[in-house]
A protein has these predicted regions:
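C-terminal accessory/connector segments of nucleic-acid motor ATPases
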Residues: 351-418
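Helicase motor core with emphasis on the C-terminal RecA-like subdomain
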Residues: 3-11, 16-19, 23-45, 53-55, ...
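Gly/serine-rich nucleotide phosphate-binding loop at the start of the catalytic core
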Residues: 60-61, 256
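Conserved Rossmann-like nucleotide-cofactor binding loop
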Residues: 67
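Amphipathic alpha-helical repeat elements characteristic of tetratricopeptide repeat
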Residues: 2-3, 360
Length: 418
C-alpha cells in the first residue's frame, strides 16, 4: 500500500518540499543520476533521507565530514536507522553494530542510511558489491572536492571505481554548495554519471550586504571588524595565529569571543563550536577548519580577515550567514596585497600541475572580485559561476557597497575579466 507523501513529510517536520527537492527526489525514485548545486541550508539531507523512507532500501551517503555524520545521526534517529562508518567500525546510535545487525543490513532486512567517508567506502568494496540490490542511492556530498585543492581530493577522484563494482549501479546523487560549470562537467566525467539531471540554485541572495575594504594595519582592521559585528559573527582568518590574535583583541574590547582552528584538540574544537552554536560566544575567529558541514542558522555576520583562497570557498563561507527567514546578513572582506603573497605560497605547494593551474584561475576570480569597485558584487558572483563574464544585463542587487555608490560601469565588465 502506498503511503501518502505528507505522512513522510510530517515525520520529517515538513509541510511541503521545495521545488528543487521534489525534482531531486522524483529523479532518484526514477533511477536517474543527479548533480545538485545547492546552497548551504537548502536541505540537501532531505533529498536522500526521503527516498530511503519511501523505498525502504539502504542509502549510502559519502561525506568527508565526521561532524556532519554525527549531526545527521542525532537529527534523524527518530525517523530512520542511521549508521556511521568513518573508521574500521560501523556505529549505530554511538554503539558499534553487532555482527547480526551488519548481516541484516547486508541482506536488506535492516534498510538504513549509511554515512561513510570516501576512504571507508572504497575500503568496503566486497561488502557494498554484495548489497547491490538493496541499495537505492549513493549520495556524494561536497562533490566539488573532486576538483579542488584539498586533503580529500585523491579519495574523491577514486570514487569512480564503484562503476565497476555493480552489474547495475544504483543512481548517484552528487551535491555541493557552489560550483562552476567547468567543475560540474568535471564531476560528471570523473564519476561517469549517465545523463545526469542537473539541479542548480543561483548563489545570488537578496538578503546579504556585501562589501570589501582595504586593511592598513591591525589596529585599523580591529576597528573595522568592531563596526561590522552584528549578532552572531564569524571572522575567517588565513592563519591559526590570526584567529587567536583577533579573538584576544576583541575580548579586550568586551566581546565574548573565541577561536577555532585545526591546531586545537578535537575536544577543544567541539567545545568552542558548541558554545558558539548556543550563543555563549558572540564572535568566533576561525580558519576554514570551521567550514563544511557547519549547521548554524542564526549567524548574522561573516567577516574575512584576508581574502579567501577562491570564489568557491568565499561563497560557501558567506552562505552560512542569514539562513533564517527574514534575516539580513552582513559580509565583508578585509584585504591587503600581502594576502595574495600568502595565497601564492599555498599555490606553490600543489604538486599536480593541472590542479595548480585550475587553482590559479580560481584565485584570479577572487582577486578581481576584491579589487573591483564599480560593478555589483552579487552580479560578479553570479557571472563567475555561470561563466558569463561578458554579460551586460545591468543586474544590480542594490545591497552591496558598489551598488550603494550608485554608479553603473556595466560596459567595463568585459575589460575587467580580460
Amino acid at each position: 500500500m502506498r503511503v501518502p507523501l505528507k505522512n513522510y513529510l510530517e515525520k520529517l517536520g515538513l509541510s511541503k518540499l521545495k521545488k528543487e527537492q521534489k525534482e531531486i527526489v522524483t529523479s532518484v525514485l526514477n533511477g536517474k543520476d543527479i548533480i545538485g548545486v545547492l546552497p548551504t541550508g537548502f536541505g540537501k539531507s532531505i533529498c536522500y533521507i526521503l527516498p530511503h523512507m519511501i523505498l525502504m532500501k539502504t542509502v549510502i551517503v559519502i561525506s568527508p565530514l565526521i561532524s556532519l555524520m554525527k549531526d545527521q545521526q542525532r537529527r534523524y534517529k527518530d525517523v530512520c536507522t542511521i549508521v556511521t562508518s568513518f573508521s574500521q567500525n560501523m556505529d549505530l546510535d554511538d554503539r558499534q553494530i553487532t555482527h547480526d545487525q551488519k548481516k541484516d543490513i547486508f541482506d536488506g532486512k535492516l534498510p538504513c542510511v549509511i554515512y561513510m567517508t570516501p576512504e571507508n567506502f572504497l575500503s568496503r568494496e566486497s561488502w557494498i558489491k554484495g548489497m547491490e540490490k538493496h541499495i537505492s542511492l549513493i549520495a556524494i556530498d561536497e562533490c566539488h572536492c573532486i576538483s579542488s585543492w584539498s586533503e580529500f581530493r585523491s579519495s574523491y577522484t577514486a570514487l569512480n571505481k564503484m562503476n565497476k563494482w555493480f552489474k547495475k549501479r544504483p543512481p548517484i546523487m552528487a551535491v555541493t554548495g557552489t560550483a562552476t560549470k567547468k567543475t560540474i562537467n568535471l564531476v560528471a566525467n570523473v564519476l561517469e554519471l549517465k545523463n545526469p539531471v542537473y539541479i542548480h540554485i543561483s548563489p545570488t541572495r537578496d538578503n546579504l550586504n556585501l562589501s570589501v575594504m582595504y586593511k592598513h594595519d591591525f589596529k585599523n582592521s580591529i576597528s573595522i571588524i568592531r563596526d561590522k559585528i552584528q549578532g552572531k559573527t564569524i571572522v575567517y582568518c588565513k592563519t591559526q595565529k590570526d584567529t587567536e590574535k583577533i579573538s584576544n583583541a576583541l575580548s579586550h574590547w568586551g566581546y565574548v569571543s573565541g577561536y577555532y582552528h585545526a591546531g586545537l584538540s578535537r575536544e577543544n574544537r567541539d567545545s568552542v563550536q558548541n558554545k558558539f552554536t548556543l550563543g555563549k560566544i558572540d564572535v568566533l575567529a576561525a580558519t576554514v577548519a570551521f567550514g563544511m558541514g557547519i549547521d548554524i542558522s542564526d549567524i548574522e555576520t561573516i567577516i574575512h580577515y584576508g581574502i579567501p583562497k577562491d570564489m568557491e570557498s568565499y561563497c560557501q563561507e558567506i552562505g552560512r550567514a542569514a539562513r533564517e527567514k527574514d534575516m539580513q546578513g552582513t559580509c565583508c572582506i578585509l584585504w591587503s596585497k600581502g594576502d595574495f603573497v600568502i595565497n601564492n605560497i599555498f599555490l606553490k605547494q600543489i604538486d599536480d600541475y593541472e590542479l595548480r593551474c585550475k587553482q590559479r584561475e580560481q584565485m584570479k576570480g577572487i582577486e578581481l572580485y576584491v579589487k573591483n569597485t564599480n560593478i555589483c558584487r552579487m552580479r560578479l558572483i553570479r557571472d563567475y559561476f555561470q561563466g558569463t563574464y561578458y554579460s551586460s544585463d545591468g543586474f544590480k542587487c542594490n545591497n552591496c557597497d558598489n551598488c550603494m555608490n550608485k554608479k553603473d560601469f556595466s560596459n567595463h565588465l568585459k575589460t575587467l575579466y580580460i
